[in-house]
Amino acid sequence: MTDLHIVILAGPHDRINCPVTTVLEKNHKLDGIAWFKDEETGAWYPADAWTNDDKKTEIAMVFPELKVNQEIELGLDKNGPADKESLLKKKQVTVAKKSEKEYDIKINEESLTTLHVNDRNRPFLHPFIGPFGDPITRNYPMQIGIPGETKDHPHHTSIWTAYGEVNEVDHWSVEKMAGTQETKSVPVASSGVAVGRIVLLNEWKNKFGEFDITERREMRFFNLPRGHQTIDFTVTLKAVNDDVKFGDTKEGGLLSVRVATSMDGDKGGRIENCYGAIGERECWGKQAPWVDYSGNVKGNRVGFAMLEHPSSFRHPTYWHVRDYGLFSANPFGLKHFTKGKLNGDYTLKKGGSIEFVYRLIAHAGDATTAKIKEKYLDYICSPEIKEI
């Protein structure tokens, strides 16, 4: 054992399939899998550990179940259990570089998604495999000719980040003069027992190759079973060469999803938010901490819940969510969403940065059966990990 001891505090809620990350007070110089042991029961708890950008140790764990107010005291054991290799077999998130433009993400040897960079104007995740083993985002325009799929909006690339008016450059569409997001490097592409992590460093360029915005995008893919697949997104935009104006337009989403065509709201799908609003009419252009979009894929009810963290810029965000399948968080399009009552223009001063923080959950059923209300509490008031 070492001198690192932690306590897990569940808090006043039951927790099911709950990911937890925390930054420790000190830099313990841990990197990779860290094994924690409950000395009372002998149970082992694997975690992923790394040194973050602030030079502190960050750890991630996943808890299949915690009871109300449960406390678990754990100590770090650098050797781990004798049978750790068998315990870890198949139970990991793997991030594998497939090519210079593709990274495959698997959970317990089952495909989740593929990250594409420097392709189709901006990074995106496609395909995305849902709770029952079928893709639950639209395949067009990456794949053409799939029976029954809609073919509108070719800039809707499964799961992506984009915005339509950045210093008057269109970073949303794929029109002739549209901007691009060029991935300059991928400094982190790590596998783990609790989480797989990818960090992208992007430049948002105009058609002439000039840029005023740099982006750091971190994606965390948690080791959770199908029906509970969870990804955390942190998008940080920085003005590097001049002030940057984000103009007011509905055309954008700092996190965007195009759901599978069979899930569309006008094909029997269901859009709902945390306040009980249902459908495009009640949810489009409204503020809410989370929105859920569910529908049928090959006879199974599945959905996406998009949750915004309170630390995110202009929380709670407005939602650009449509019956035809678009699902995106847009904190700038206030003029459109409020029929001219408010203006969402925002100027980011040179050297300044803004951050957008979301969790995306792919689930079985609708928002009620997937317990998205409880999942939001897990996100914003997660169990605590404290050093003792």
Regions found by a protein language model. Name each.
Residues Q92-K98, A189-G192, I198-T249:
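Acidic, contiguous internal or C-terminal segments within carbohydrate-active enzymes
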Residues M1-Q92, L115, D119-L201:
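Alpha-mannosidase-like glycoside hydrolase catalytic domains involved in N-glycan trimming
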Residues Q70-P81, E109, L200-N202, R217, ...:
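Short, hydrophobic/aromatic-enriched beta-strand segments in well-ordered soluble domains
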Residues V20-T22, I59, L74, I198-L200, ...:
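Hydrophobic residues positioned within well-ordered beta-strands of beta-sheet architectures
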Residues S86-T114, G130-F132, I136-I144, F211-E218, ...:
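Terminal, non-catalytic protein-protein interaction segments that mediate quaternary/complex assembly
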Residues W50-L66, L307-I388:
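Beta-strand-rich recognition/accessory modules
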Residues N108, L115-G130, L224-E272:
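Acidic (Asp/Glu-rich), glycine- and aromatic
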Residues D243-K245, T249-Y318:
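Active-site/ligand-binding surface loops and adjacent short beta/alpha elements
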